[in-house]
């Protein structure tokens, strides 16, 4: 009678996730000498896994004299749930070689899940090969897991091949394929598959929305979310709200973001920590740091992401002192910072010239928190040194850091050379960039050309352009979005087909004429790398996407309200000058989020102090 009693009690612990009670029952079972009973041991492994105590599950498993497939699958699942998927593979390997057990369908599912979590396609293919020759080769649950694994690893053709081989497809396999297409930016295929999905539930809607957000297709994500609301799908899980808040953040769609925030409150999810974290990030990216701070202050429970999201938001908007003060508050509350926290902190120091504080924080990462600096941390420190005129120290950092420097690292130093007037050093670094990298960032091309042009090295300018042509560089078309009265309008560079093109042209022309008279503005055509006459270059500058977006905002937005722009590329130097002048002439605040930072244009000045 003892064993059935304890089995029942342990099953209740698993259902209710009561770890303390499970440990007490375990102690009684050990004391009674029945811990080696296989059903009890299997249940203990399962209970500890369900309660998030993977180390206890593994200990019970290791002490079992006789292991079966149930215990094997349970411990592998427990390790996966604890984000210890690497350990999952090693435990599988050791048990398989020592006990002679062959994996069953549950073990295969756990292994495939581990490979998906790790993004380890090599291990995943090995598991797939073992599965194909096993007696479970037609198991459709394992096949669905394989679809998910291949999709998460970006191998959509392999995922589709497995998907097509499933006779009776379940929600997992359908959703995995839809999510895979969406995450890869294959919009049409994702939507086509989603439309024919037999049963759409919240999980499948969330997968499509989340996939679009992750691939940078915020407008598509919001469109799907709107359709989901029209279909009256019950939102019983806050994950979909977190995804759509992320879409609003990426689009800097503050009006839509506030509407989603209202929905979060109405549905009672405002106490969820990860939802609040997403809202902090959203408001910061919509340039409303006050609202982000308000969300933070109202949170009853905060984790490291909560603190870090607000620190990064403050840093990106030039509020370095506030970001550093918040970090001190975070530490005093006993919250341990993570890697992202330090990226935000060093970035904050970089934009106000706090060299010693930046160095101190960089050293504190390892000394106080055991965090190994990444290439991103080194690049932030290099940017800090470069902005402060310490170019020799910055270059020495590149040569001594434990990572091979990449294009953004060298480009950060090259930008500092241009700003600090270190022409010879800039030319040397530019030569190194051209000879050592297949350049990918459009802003690097412009920087190279300007460095060579400033030294009147026209042959090098031509050579750089020729090499860029040989590399077949395909830069994303420049585009800018502006949110006006609940609608997001997108403009592309050179676009002259907008319904309001005549109004936009007249306003931009009027503003340009006033800039020329009032501010002595002369278009800086060095930002146009095409081989054409000056008049054509000026025309290209005139139709840069951020200018059209600002003009549209001035025409359509509520008078006196800030105009918020999101651009996918770095703002060019000429547009930066133009936006400063427009902010002064129109007495409007213009906030631009480009590929590198936030710019607050107000009264003829920019928060970046002309260095971005």
Curated annotation (Swiss-Prot):
Principal cellular location given in the protein's record: mitochondrion
Residue segments, region Type E(+) motif: 486-516
Keywords of the record: Mitochondrion, mRNA processing, Repeat, Transit peptide
Region Type E motif, annotated ranges: 409-485
The keyword Repeat belongs to this UniProt entry's keyword annotation: yes
GO BP, one annotated term: cytidine to uridine editing
Swiss-Prot/TrEMBL PPR repeat ranges: 37-71, 72-103, 104-138, 139-169, 170-204, 205-235, 237-271, 272-302, 303-337, 338-373, 374-408
InterPro entries: DYW_dom (IPR032867), E_motif (IPR046848), Pentatricopeptide_rpt (IPR002885), PPR_At4g14850-like_plant (IPR046960), TPR-like_helical_dom_sf (IPR011990)
GO MF annotations, alphabetized: RNA binding; zinc ion binding
Transit peptide: 1-24
Region annotation Type DYW motif: where it falls in the sequence: 518-612
Pfam families in UniProt: DYW_deaminase, E_motif, PPR, PPR_2
Highest taxon, organism lineage: Eukaryota
Record's subcellular location: Mitochondrion
Known function: Involved in C-to-U editing of mitochondrial RNA. Required specifically for editing the mitochondrial NAD4, MT-CYB/COB and RPL16 transcripts.
Family (UniProt): Belongs to the PPR family. PCMP-H subfamily.
NCBIfam families: PPR
Record's subunit section: Interacts with MORF8/RIP1 and MORF1/RIP8.
Protein's UniProt name: Pentatricopeptide repeat-containing protein At4g14050, mitochondrial
Species of the source: Arabidopsis thaliana (Mouse-ear cress)
Annotated gene: PCMP-H13
